[in-house]
Amino acid sequence: MNSGIDLEMSFTQGVQNLGLSHELAHLLWIPLPMLLVLVSAVIGVLVTVWLERKISAAAQQRIGPEYAGALGILQPMADGLKLLVKEDIIPARADSVLFTVGPILVLVPVILSWLIVPFGQNLLISNVGIGIFLWIALSSIQPIGLLMSGYSSNNKYSLLGGLRAAAQSISYEIPLALAVLAIVMMSNSLSTVDIVEQQNTAGLLSWNIWRQPVGFIIFWICALAECERLPFDLPEAEEELVAGYQTEYSGMKFALFYLAGYINLVLSALLVSVLYLGGWGFPISIDWFSSLIGLSIDNPLVQIIAASLGIVMTILKAYLLVFLAILLRWTTPRVRIDQLLDLGWKFLLPISLVNLLVTASLKLAFPITFGG
């Protein structure tokens, strides 16, 4: 958008105009970004599950959910309530501690990763300087929980699923990190807010997808593999492993895996939006919009409208990618485990290294275009 958009300042000034102190106005602002992220995560999962069911039904020439609310929109809530009231069973010969900790260790890093997702300049919980690498570090914890769940179940299918999950994550974590490193090199920052602001200097044409098309493809493939979406759902392949590492789980513990998968998918789509598609930026200039309605860009009304449009743009870009991921799941065949590992180690890793080298060379040759 524009460096002048500061929703926090506009909010505090508006509250102060009502007669409240600056300290109280700032205190009232603090929970708002957290509330936005929490609501976005919950609604994001519900909408994604509903889209998954409807798109899969369309792909298979079915109607899909239609009785739970209008167009079946309440079906995800019904699924959640069903899992909540089901009996929580721990297998007799399973390691009960690891069996319980595993799903928690899978879900918690995904939720913590939402700390660094910006919906606007001040609409994020934590603008840490190493935000994007913090996400990579947190995502590397998840396979430990998957392996722990597979091992503790005392089931051969669960163990194989856990081992596959660990191998898949290691194979795709490295090219994903190298693709992110190319973005960091151009942006001169690890902050997600700085990366978005750097993409909005010249509108649509300054988005990183035009300067990093190869990196965008690598990142998206690796993100799908990290989310274990088809064609990369080898750890839970139904035809081979029953349900993989989830085989022995039921009730709320199974729901944690279910929830983590969809939260991770929405999170990955949001990060692609932030890193490559300009985040909250949109083609219409805020300066042009403010002059059109005859108000200054510092006007609180313009600030609120601009921030709201930014949130909408971020979500629209993310859900375009979510729609693509769901469509891929129901229209592509599953790859074999050897093909999956070959793709990660023999293709994506060398290509991501070459992409990083080319980015460094272009940064030296064209410092203005590539963020010198």
Curated annotation (Swiss-Prot):
Keywords: Membrane, NAD, NADP, Plastoquinone, Quinone, Thylakoid, Translocase, Transmembrane, Transmembrane helix. It comes from the Bacteria. NDH-1 shuttles electrons from an unknown electron donor, via FMN and iron-sulfur (Fe-S) centers, to quinones in the respiratory and/or the photosynthetic chain. The immediate electron acceptor for the enzyme in this species is believed to be plastoquinone. Couples the redox reaction to proton translocation, and thus conserves the redox energy in a proton gradient. Belongs to the complex I subunit 1 family. Its EC number is 7.1.1.-. NDH-1 is composed of at least 11 different subunits. It is a multi-pass membrane protein. This is NAD(P)H-quinone oxidoreductase subunit 1. The chain crosses the membrane at residues 27-47, 97-117, 128-148, 166-186, 204-224, 266-286, 308-328, 348-368. It is found in: Cellular thylakoid membrane. GO terms for cellular component: plasma membrane-derived thylakoid membrane. HAMAP family: NDH1_NuoH. The keyword Transmembrane applies. The gene is ndhA. It is an enzyme of class 7 (translocase). The keyword Oxidoreductase does not apply. GO terms for molecular function: NADH dehydrogenase activity; oxidoreductase activity, acting on NAD(P)H, quinone or similar compound as acceptor; quinone binding. Its main location: membrane. GO terms for biological process: aerobic respiration; photosynthesis, light reaction. It catalyses: a plastoquinone + NADH + (n+1) H(+)(in) = a plastoquinol + NAD(+) + n H(+)(out); a plastoquinone + NADPH + (n+1) H(+)(in) = a plastoquinol + NADP(+) + n H(+)(out).
